[in-house]
Amino acid sequence: MSQKYLFIDRDGTLISEPPSDFQVDRFDKLAFEPEVIPVLLKLQKAGFKLVMITNQDGLGTQSFPQADFDGPHNLMMQIFTSQGVCFDEVLICPHLPADDCDCRKPKVKLVERYLAEQAMDSANSYVIGDRATDIQLADNMGITGLRYHRETLNWTMIGEQLTKRDRYAHVVRNTKETQIDVSVWLDREGNSKINTGVGFFDHMLDQIATHGGFRMEITVKGDLYIDDHHTVEDTGLALGEALKLALGDKRGICRFGFVLPMDECLARCALDISGRPHLEYKAEFTYQRVGDLSTEMIEHFFRSLSYTMGVTLHLKTKGKNDHHRVESLFKAFGRTLRQAIRVEGDTLPSSKGVL
């Protein structure tokens, strides 16, 4: 998975910018913006890597000697490092606007390597700065810009905005047999809308969302004039992919889940969001169909889902009523998924450092 980055301006964003000459060229001019250090620590824990990018007009010239810049800058970096704030890179353009160089913000020369394919997670990377040129840089990079201001968008607000969970994914899967559109919101509940053309299957998918504590919208157009095979199978593939994408870097998730009794049935579900697809399934049914859903397709659905989601899934149910047996499997999976996707911290739940 590609990396999340924050490209952060220096003067006026990390540290205060002197209004007299816009140069931090003496130690007494060095002052940190409020809450910048604790918020950057919080953002690092949330998985962001930090890159400083700054225009320093005329750096190295008589109007702004390098030595005058180096003292306060090095002290600033030492303070950041001593508090645990680590910048992967510090990118500096020393030119004046009149020089018409390639590296001055909002041009992208300094950040070209991050624009290579899959070098960064563009959907979750940001430019943070106090000037319009910082927002223009974000536009040129194809990422979101956040314009820092002590009153309207300060570091506390930025930290809250960037660490607030709203895990979402949208998957479209089109084949000759099916056209499927799936959206999932892992941190929202209710208002799920599901239409696969197979009524009982819709009801079962809704059980996953309801007991999983999340919202999803699924629309399927399948070759039901033949049977429900492709509709159920491809829905499982698309839903599994959407859940995997919505989980993102999996940082802070519980990872494991277990459960569930239902009426005369006892369903057991064990789930590990491991990155290793595997299904163990045991369920017997008296009839070939429950409503308009083929009972043989239930295992196929969970196998397809576990494959694209990348999870280890054990499912088992016993009971007397086919409807209850089927429903117990979907409810147990939903309830188990609720436990596993819940966020309880900010670390990756793996001794290997990867899921």
UniProtKB/Swiss-Prot annotation:
Renumbered residue ranges of the record's region Imidazoleglycerol-phosphate dehydratase: 167-355
GO biological process: L-histidine biosynthetic process
Record's keyword annotation contains Repressor: no
Main location: cytoplasm
Record localization: Cytoplasm
Catalytic activity: D-erythro-1-(imidazol-4-yl)glycerol 3-phosphate = 3-(imidazol-4-yl)-2-oxopropyl phosphate + H2O; L-histidinol phosphate + H2O = L-histidinol + phosphate
EC number: 3.1.3.15, 4.2.1.19
Keyword Membrane part of the UniProt annotation: no
Similarity comment: family membership: In the N-terminal section; belongs to the histidinol-phosphatase family.
Stated name of the protein: Histidine biosynthesis bifunctional protein HisB
